[in-house]
Amino acid sequence: MSSAGGEGPEAGPGRAGGRSEPEAPGSALSVDLPGLLGQLARSFALLLPVYALGYLGLSFSWVLLALGLLAWCRRSRGLKASRLCRALALLEDEEQAVRLGVRACDLPAWVHFPDTERAEWLNKTVKHMWPFICQFIEKLFRETIEPAVRGANAHLSTFSFTKVDVGQQPLRVNGVKVYTENVDKRQIILDLQISFVGNCEIDLEIKRYFCRAGVKSIQIHGTMRVILEPLIGDMPLVGALSIFFLRKPLLEINWTGLTNLLDIPGLNGLSDTIILDIISNYLVLPNRITVPLVSEVQIAQLRFPIPKGVLRIHFIEAQDLQGKDTYLKGLVKGKSDPYGIIRVGNQIFQSKVIKENLSPKWNEVYEALVYEHPGQELEIELFDEDPDKDDFLGSLMIDLIEVEKERLLDEWFTLDEVPKGKLHLKLEWLTLMPDAANLDKVLADIRADKDQASDGLSSALLILYLDSARNLPSGKKINSNPNPLVQMSVGHKAQESKIRYKTSEPVWEENFTFFIHNPRRQDLEVEVKDEQHQCSLGSLRIPLSQLLTSDNMTINQRFQLSNSGPNSTLKMKIALRVLHLEKQERPPDYQHSAQVKRPSVSKEGRKMPIKSQMSASPGTGGANTAPSTPVMGVDDKPAMEEKPQPPEASPLGHRDLGRSSSSLLASPSHIAAKEPTPSIASDISLPIATQELRQRLRQLENGTTLGQSPLGQIQLTIRHSSQRNKLIVVVHSCRNLIAFSEDGSDPYVRMYLLPDKRRSGRRKTHVSKKTLNPVFDQSFDFSVSLPEVQRRTLDVAVKNSGGFLSKDKGLLGKVLVVLASEELAKGWTQWYDLTEDGTRPQVIT
């Protein structure tokens, strides 16, 4: 008993210390609830795709596609991480990185170019200032960007940056080049090779929708030009500072959170392109940031840059290209489907594709603005078009300073980075003249027709500086300020300004350029619109002939808007410049000094700036999509010099001054991207769709005799416009279509101008819901000349639209219209019978 009694007091505390007090049931539940909800969410996310596959009746191939997409995402993320580590190692210790071995394209600019200086003193200064730069950037995000995003939309009212850390790695200048030749004596031009590899963390959150996203690393590389002008005799000796990129910089972003979806193949290039386009709107030539250093400097004059000249590129032909298409696993050599990518600064042009030809003839013309010719080159790359990845056929790079000296070059150039191949170019440097003395001669040289206002080569350049507007009306609502934007058009070319929100006194300070075919017959049309209510706030029409009689062919004033308020005005500065080719007399044995610039890095490294920017979709809509330097269509072209024969040994042959009647065709497009060729998928699915339609037709027949047009008919108007140099197709309506489901059909019309079945050549109408007799009344056009269109066939297909992953998609009928008719210029309207495969071409005579 005593022992028991002795154990009691000793054991009691021991049990009390070893056993915790019982917890309340509510507290245990509150601790496990988040984990339970997370487990349920993960289980739901895993089971939902399985349920969706069964519910929609999809095949197992969708599972394989998802796994392949996941593997691709992980591989892409791993490659991004390796590139980031390599760039960080190069920034931390250049000498050690070079010893260990680094690719030539990753080396700094001062290694390749002797006139580029290494500026370590500048990098040390930036490194010392970097913590304070980071503080400024954090304040910019939290005090400027965050309130602006919150006020932009009611759904973003809870938007906030949870973390803004730019990282410890400072911005680095890999090389500095100062220009001393071909520059104005009152300016200093510097090119900075900048590189930023930041292990930054920028996280954002929208609490209202439990949405988190962010960025964990950013890489940006590019050439930034700094211009100090004008130099003055008083302190601080420089009037203003202008900063811009010569071309779009290279950009790579690693996303976190919800924005990880942007790393999915197909979306990663699109997201980077959108961000690059935003940067281009502010910082890529001709856009620039101008900082005045003294009050006396006319900042508006610095923001109204006049191009140094216009480069007219005759992209004529190539010879002896490599055959990249092979058969039987390379045993049989084939030909190539060559096309060219031409680049001048930030302007990118793409030629048409010549099928199966090693000596293609393009005969196309491009016109490009040149703002800063010191440091700018004409870059050309040739590729063989393939369904998967286009093969490289050669490149060429020509310094624009040499072209300016020569004024006219008509030569065969040997392609670089390939064993064989030559390219025939004719380059013209057009000077901008501020008077109309040579206008008649220029119009005669380009054969400008009096009845032809806007087609053909350009005779002049219109430069417009949109400053501001005052006293704009309120639009539809009296008590609300409008969201004004300005639409400007000359002929068929139109451009838009940025939107200024909630103001009747907008300030734009934007530059625009238009190539003009005949300034005596064309007008500048300007309209101010309210983006919020889609209504007009005022308009203005200025005949370009008015500029011909103005002082220095320039007008700088406030214009009274019509159909607007009594005091509504728009301030603009407009200048017209005549494009004049100054031909120089040369002796017969004259040898020009133009040299082809050889690449200093490998083909993969040098092509990165071009190929990285060729992923933008040209079909993106919205403001600022109209190019400021469009390729001009050529209908009546001047006769050009006979094409010289390619040289046997020298890359630069002698000029043949013989004459012939050969002419150049129009360039089909001015785009910023090389489009894929989706016709492969269309060709694969076509037999399946035709087979399904035939089976559906047999079910409809079911022992009965169908009429003459069992699939129905479609009404089209087809004509060719010689003034616009386009084929016009109007889709009016369809009748007596077959029902694709119990609710009828959801038809739309798709068209190709064969043999072109690329995405850029496709035209589609809107979808008419639940009807067998849809009415479209939509007009479409194809840029093609009359002789060319008479050798083509119009492929028209009526299809049934369905929802995403729907089984109700399919073909309702096709028709092939052979356009070999002499009545095409007049046009016709006709009903066409739909067939299951369109194998009965319908010829109009």
Curated annotation (Swiss-Prot):
Compositional bias annotation for Polar residues: 612-628
Short name of one Pfam family: C2
GO CC annotation: cytoplasmic side of plasma membrane; cytosol; endoplasmic reticulum membrane; endoplasmic reticulum-plasma membrane contact site; organelle membrane contact site
Binding site for Ca(2+) 3: D386, D388, D390
Residues in the Cytoplasmic compartment per record: 1-27, 73-845
GO terms assigned for molecular function: calcium ion binding; phosphatidylcholine binding; phosphatidylethanolamine binding; phosphatidylinositol binding
Principal subcellular localisation of the protein: membrane
TM segment ranges: 28-48, 52-72
Lumenal side: 49-51
Region (Required for phosphatidylinositol 4,5-bisphosphate-dependent location at the cell membrane): 757-764
SMP-LTD domain mapped to chain residues: 115-294
Keywords from the UniProt entry: Calcium, Cell membrane, Endocytosis, Endoplasmic reticulum, Lipid transport, Lipid-binding, Membrane, Metal-binding, Phosphoprotein, Repeat, Transmembrane, Transmembrane helix, Transport
Database matches in CDD domains: C2A_C2C_Synaptotagmin_like, C2B_Synaptotagmin-like, C2C_KIAA1228, SMP_ESyt2
Gene3D superfamilies for the chain: C2 domain
Modification sites for Phosphothreonine: T629
Region ranges (Disordered): 1-26, 584-664
Stretches assigned to the C2 domain: 293-413, 442-563, 710-832
Binding site for Ca(2+) 2: D325, D337, D384, E385, D386
Residues reported to bind Ca(2+) 1: K324, D325, D384, D386, D391
Domain notes for this protein: Anchored to the endoplasmic reticulum membrane by a transmembrane hairpin structure; both N-terminus and C-terminus are cytoplasmic. The C2 domains mediate lipid and calcium binding. The N-terminal C2 domain binds calcium ions and is important for calcium-dependent lipid binding and interaction with membranes. Two calcium ions are bound at a high-affinity site and a third calcium ion is bound with lower affinity. May bind up to four calcium ions. In contrast, the second C2 domain apparently does not bind calcium. The third C2 domain mediates interaction with membranes enriched in phosphatidylinositol 4,5-bisphosphate and is required for location at the cell membrane.
Protein name according to UniProt: Extended synaptotagmin-2
Source species of the chain: Mus musculus (Mouse)
Lineage summary: Eukaryota, Metazoa, Chordata, Craniata, Vertebrata
